[in-house]
From Swiss-Prot:
PANTHER family with a match to the protein in the record: CLASP, TOG ARRAY REGULATOR OF AXONEMAL MICROTUBULES PROTEIN 2
Gene Ontology annotations for the cellular component aspect, listed alphabetically: microtubule cytoskeleton
Protein name: TOG array regulator of axonemal microtubules protein 2
SMART domains: TOG
GO biological process: negative regulation of cytoskeleton organization; negative regulation of supramolecular fiber organization
Provenance organism: Mus musculus (Mouse)
Amino acid sequence: MDTRDDVTLAKVPAPVAVYCGSVPRTSVGLRAPPPGGIDSSLLAHDEASLQPVSSVLPSSEKPSQLSREHEDQSSLMLNAPLKGWQARNGYPRGLGVLPLGHHLGAAIPSLESEASSVARDTIQIKDKLKKRRLSEGMAASSQASLDPVGGPRGVPLRSTIPRTTSQRLLRVPRPMPPIQSIPTTPEANSAKEKDLDPPGGRQDLQDPGASAQEVQISRQYLHCADEKMHKSLGGLVIPPIPKARMPTGTSSCRPGSLPSPLCPSQDVLMGPKAPHTRLTCENGPLEKTPKSPASKPLVPVVKAKSAEAPETSLASSQSTFTLTAFSSHAKETRSLENEEDQKESSTKVQVTISKSAQEKMRLKQMKEMELLRRAKEPEWERELVSQGLGTRRTSAKEGLLPLRGSGALSEPAGMSSPRRNNMGALQRKRANRASLPSIPVSKQEPGFARHASANSLPAVLTLGSPEWEEEEEEMDLRALRELRPFSNPELGLTDALQCLNSNDWQMKEKGLVNIQRLAACHSEVLGTRLHDVSLAVTAEVTNLRSKVSRLAISTLGDLFRVLKKNMDQEAEEIVRCLLQKMGNTSEFIQRAANRALGAMVENVTPARALVALTSAGVYHRNPLVRKCTAKHLSAVLEQIGAEKLLSGSRDNTDMLVHNLVRLAQDSNQDTRFYGRKMVNILMANAKFDAFLKQSLPSHDLRKVMAAIKQRGIQDNHELQSAKGRKVSKSLVVCENGLPSHEGVETSEQLRELTRLLEAKEFQARMEGVGKLLEYCKAKPELVAANLVQVFDVFTPRLHDSNKKVNQWALESLAQMLPILKESIHPMLLSLIIAAADNLNSKNSGISTAASTVLDAMMGSLDHLCLLQAFAGRVRFLTGPAVLDITDRLSVLVASVYPRKPQAVERHILPVLWYFLNKMSGNGVLPGRGGNVRTAVCRLARSLQEQMGSRLQDFAASQPQQVLKALQGLLASESLGANDKVIGGRMAPDIQMTGTTCPQQLD
């Protein structure tokens, strides 16, 4: 039984700085401190000087009580393992079993040599401080303070390092929140529960005040001025974190650990090892990992009972493994992170979408959810499965199918890891983008092109292709059938009208969808307020947002399909609005309007459709509108029939025939085809002859009838070429749904030609004109098939502001005309206007080139077409252009009259009457400039030669002034002298003799 006089010495660790906060995970490794950061004297003493000298306490004092004393004063709990920041960051907790530093080899022999005797334990202080070269006086004072018999007890020990150096090395930042202590192993948990003290070993401390004083005095070296430490180290020093005390449940060596150098009968309190110091410098985070000297017993201990042997501490042999283990573990973890990042970046496609695109995607998904909630969804899905890939793509485009890959960005399988589980912020960031669709890397569909964007058209089908139009129409019908009904349709109608009256385009879109649902499921409810609904929907056709406009057009088509003849009263206003949208440049708007007009023609009363189309589209200035009108009007005539049309009132029949003749003579090739087709339908009926007898047919009607009888087969070819032109305008689609090589090449050539002709630099425009001339010589069929598209861009170059481009375009046109010949007819009028305007140019080169163009027309094109075009243009010309065109009319009269006398009488005689009526006595036209008497005399003489006395008969019906002027011109003696020379130039008949003779032979 021990008494209070029996003094048992115990080793107590000196207080150290406790870091109570989180430590950033930075790279771990031994790095040199910055120059001048640490006193040079410290390097000589090595870093073992960082470990303070411990004081002596009686062995009777209980370690647990000492632990509580330390906890009260420095918040440091001994005998209980602390939770290191390694465990907080996913590192293994049992760090004591990892490899140790390189100082262990020097510490083990020293400990083995001194462990045989209790008295020699005091020499361990020298072994520990052997690199410091302690003075003999300091060693003597240390032995005196540690003598258990003599000398004062409880004398506070002072550090062997100078105060300034200690303060510089052990500077700590402001205290941070404490770190909770958690046992690192199950054995430590059990040891903590048992207080880790042997039974009977707990004794009260003899002088707790003295020990507290020692601890307090020793702590003064840890709290020093921040300025001094900052100056010495040049950065932030993160204080050491106390290591958890390892369990001592067994004395046997575990695998991977070194055996304890102490005897089993020795009970030693091990002091903490050298701190792990980090330096944060200006260039970046650097870490200094000093060499960790082996922990040694600080004071000799008295031999205890052999029963206490299993609890011998292994902290000295285990805690020194920590730094090496942490460094290697951090490197392995970082390499794993890099591998995972590389694997993730190689298997995932990062998608960046703008905010506007995200909003569009969100709205499209809302529409999908609205359309997908329907009663017969499984049946509809089975129907879609049976259809082809193109139909599914079309349905997905219109919002009837969910986007492929919509939802959260999927993470590849096998990518889960402990690091990924700890990255909560990154996962939340990815989760916030769940509304965006993932775009997978498609490697299994080489036969189809990717979509250009979320809202782009499928690359398989081209704009304007019949396949695309048919699938859009099928999609509209399917969507109409699958719309779900309202539980309260009256309330739904009211809500739809309110939405259409809103200023928000999204609300308008919702209202249009509700109208479609009402039309599909509650058509009787719409009938009560059909006029209001029709006006509201028609008003949205002209919406500036194309999405709303197209949806409104589709809604009108649905109303026509469902309500049929109930829409008769609204047809005229709707047709006018839809035809106006046909002039829109957006092809998808044109297709939607065309389908809606087709639904109107098929479902309303044919008479209503006939009136609506003729009143709104026949006289429209846009050629696309007239073409669409002629197409649908032809379908209406086929429904009504020629007999019923000719059986109506005379005024209505005359108006109808007049409109059809106007369409048959339209400048657009397709419009002319449909117009002639309708006239041919009327001509095939027997009542048409009776109509001709009752009403005097106009010259236009006779001309159209003659053209149909002579070139009826050519009209079919005209339509085919027009349709072929539309297909070649985009891309030629092969049977497999992919564009052919020829179609792609043609499209690229036309695109490049258009770019050059519309360029800002005049050199590029001249290059474009030259390229067009090359195409006409090498590939005339290419230019002829795309004539309207090409010459719409080329014609402005005939009026180009740059004189070089203007002259070069006229000269090139003169070379193109003999190559293209009759295929140039659709653009003839615009070319004649451009050439005639250039005749008045002050630039001699431009005026000469314009005259050359007119000569090429006279030699290459049909004189009948030229006669009509020249006669219509001459009244609007001034200056030299009037003289030139009038002279050419004189030549055309001699060529055309033998074949088409009616054409001359209809077109040339009005021109002659105009000149004779407006011309003054000296031959000057007021406001036109120049003397035209000679040119008019030339024209009158040519008509007199061809018509003879009939010219006088036609003149008798004109005013007396015109008749006298004509007689004066014909009787003039100077007329023969002016036949050869007109204004110093050779007469046109002599110039054009070679070109007009073949025409005269006809």
